[in-house]
Amino acid sequence: MIFFYFLTLTSFISVAFSYNILGVFPFQAKSHFGFIDPLLVRLAELGHNVTIYDPYPKSEKLPNYNEIDVSECFVFNTLYEEIDTFIKTAASPFSSLWYSFEETLAVFQKENFDKCAPLRELLNSTVKYDLLITETFLTDITLLFVNKFKIPFITSTPNVPFPWLADRMGNPLNPSYIPNLFSDYPFDKMTFFNRLWNTLFYVMALGGHNAIILKNEEKINKYYFGSSVPSLYNIARETSIMLINAHETLNPVIPLVPGMIPVSGIHIKQPAALPQNIEKFINESTHGVVYFCMGSLLRGETFPAEKRDAFLYAFSKIPQRVLWKWEGEVLPGKSENIMTSKWMPQRDILAHPNVKLFISHGGLLGTSEAVYEGVPVIGIPIFGDQRTNIKALEANGAGELLDYNDISGEVVLEKIQRLINDPKYKESARQLSIRYKDRPMSPLDTAVYWTEYVIRHKGAPHLKTAAVDMPWYQYLLLDVIAFLIFILVSVILIIYYGVKISLRYLCALIFGNSSSLKPTKKVKDN
């Protein structure tokens, strides 16, 4: 009887396992780390020991969360350049892609890795980890630590996966109907030339990344670990799962293999109380508030004077108040209805019911926050996936795109008035918000579940498709197509020569010897 009670009691006891988790995030883009940071913090809250190497350390220490600053490593020289500079690099999807490759190649070099003391020390660490979490956006340099620790790893990407990321997961990314994230091609039906350029982009992206970025980083891999270790290309194909910032309300609908986990909105927390001055400014606005922010990389103060003045003119003509994230000390010509600050709690501002409009560059984190709260958006895309994000809002009736080159006082004013005064935009944004929130689990709970799943199942290799290990010509069925063409051509040739020989034979039977059919020569009389 005692034994029976013991079994009954133990059946209600849940055993919690604590894992050692390593995170390495040297890529210096705050929104990129902001996408995955909530997962890392949540894992620490659940009792796991989390060690993170990142360029944005927190001001206060968290339990179970050990943070090492790598902000001095791999610094991008172009960070916070003038907006006009970014515009020139993003003239086309191809120029955006090449610019991204150039910057990545320039920064993630062996000499910069050698200068990064925290990561060099990590290469010599004897600590045992159960899992690596890292970002593989443009660089795969952090996969060095898979060779070091021989552990399963999870990667994240702050947008829809690039072709090289989909390829390593064996995930289909068909350019015939899935537009690349640097383009503004329609989601529903691309034209012939859209599909042509889209296909060329996919080929260049995949080939360029493997030939340029991976080739450079492979030298670093071989330098530290020797020539006998697995290549970064092969390591990348061992990715357990990839957490992607994608959702069908904001991105093209794409097929996903089990290892591709969409967690768009993972960074969206419950809104916190606003600073008193901002809350007072919003609450006292009879006609509502417009929030204007160009993200963490693009600084509003770098707007050319004529662009800045266009917004100042438009803002001075509307009854709404304006919150403008302005990084400079003084905003010249600021009207009384404008409040500026170098930093603003964007997520909490967008959650306020008196915020009527969000003017943004179209970054995916800010766009998803606006969608979550049902706030219409005017998007001014500058580079990267921003144009695609705004096009998605436009297609859903929840926003409009404002081309940077079209900015003028009258154009900005007309767009603001239309999106605020026409109720269809607010209603479309509300419907989009409902669809965006309608999920079986929260994005954060989803990410936590799959992270622990990978550890429990030793890397979860059963989630991989056979496509991961297939040569490209087999994956594209080129060998099968070539064989079928060979069979078809062979059959056609057999039929052709069979008919030809048969006809010749029949002619011989009907008309006698074929030589008798030839015309006879006239004998010339002498």
From Swiss-Prot:
PROSITE patterns tied to this protein: UDPGT
Name of the molecule in the record: UDP-glycosyltransferase UGT5
Cytoplasmic side: 496-526
EC id: 2.4.1.-
Gene3D superfamilies: Glycogen Phosphorylase B (3.40.50.2000)
Gene source species: Dactylopius coccus
Family that this chain belongs to: Belongs to the UDP-glycosyltransferase family.
Gene: UGT5
Residues in compartment: Lumenal: 1-474
Subcellular location: Microsome membrane
